[in-house]
């Protein structure tokens, strides 16, 4: 479980407790919080929780490097084959994690399944944020053909080895489905709950994501055009 956070002091304790409750008894797990240069009490509150939650590991960036780099730091440090991520603001529901794990174990899934992407079918956000996200997802899906209705959802389950093979750049977490498919992996979307933010303030706005998102979109499209996946024919004599 990798959780990137920045200045989420009021969300740390309730979310850690929810994650531990959701995963207790289901599987062996660790919770890795990556503090991306917080300037509030986030780090202190995480450290205070380690005595109660021995599975909690805390990594800190001295200065903020962005959400994608925080996720990469956590995935690199992880000790398990499969990684779950969720946002540290409390809007993703940890109770959905067992459902993702169940889908991973479903024998009907494709053999090359590498990513299960959460899909916030009913978002608890402002109208402007929902509208901008719907437009962005539509444009991205049309350009990248990633067949994923919601790439911005922080709740994902993916293979650690696959993630570490992907091109790494700022905001790459929003393009994981396209990048995984570029490497030949299958992606499956799973409906998940989305909750209203109860504490703290969002680090993202419509305007500070727009132009960066456009540049990144064309960059990922360029990467896709540079890859041709072979169709392997089995030698009938062997």
Feature map (PLM): residue ranges:
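Hydrophobic transmembrane-helix microenvironments that flank and shape a buried ionizable site
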Residues: 5-8, 153, 213
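Structured catalytic core of nucleotide-sugar glycosyltransferases
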Residues: 1-126, 161, 165, 178-182, ...
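Short, flexible, basic/aromatic active-site loop/helix in glycosyltransferases
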Residues: 101, 108-157, 161-164, 215-219
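Hydrophobic helical membrane-anchoring modules
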Residues: 138, 145, 169-238
């Amino acid at each position: 479980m990798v959780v990137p956070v920045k200045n989420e002091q009021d969300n740390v304790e309730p979310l850690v407790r929810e994650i531990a409750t959701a995963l207790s008894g289901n599987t062996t797990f660790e919770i890795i919080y990556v503090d991306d240069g917080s300037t509030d009490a986030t780090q202190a509150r995480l450290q205070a929780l380690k005595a109660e939650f021995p599975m909690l590991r805390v990594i800190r960036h001295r200065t903020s490097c962005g959400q994608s780099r925080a996720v990469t730091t956590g995935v690199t440090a992880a000790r398990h084959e499969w990684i779950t991520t969720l946002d540290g603001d409390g809007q993703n529901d940890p109770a959905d994690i067992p459902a993702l794990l169940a889908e991973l174990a479903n024998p009907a899934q494709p053999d090359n399944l590498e990513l299960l992407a959460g899909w916030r079918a009913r978002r608890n956000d402002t109208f402007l944020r929902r509208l901008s996200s719907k437009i962005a997802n539509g444009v991205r899906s049309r350009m990248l053909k990633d067949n994923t209705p919601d790439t911005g959802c922080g709740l994902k389950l993916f293979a650690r080895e696959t993630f570490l093979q992907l091109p790494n750049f700022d905001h790459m977490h929003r393009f994981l489905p396209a990048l995984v498919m570029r490497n030949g992996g299958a992606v499956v979307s799973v409906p998940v709950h989305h909750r209203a933010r109860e504490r703290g303030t969002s680090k993202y706005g419509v305007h500070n994501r727009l132009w960066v998102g456009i540049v990144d979109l064309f960059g990922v499209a360029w990467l896709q055009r540079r890859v041709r996946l072979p169709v392997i024919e089995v030698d009938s004599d062997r």
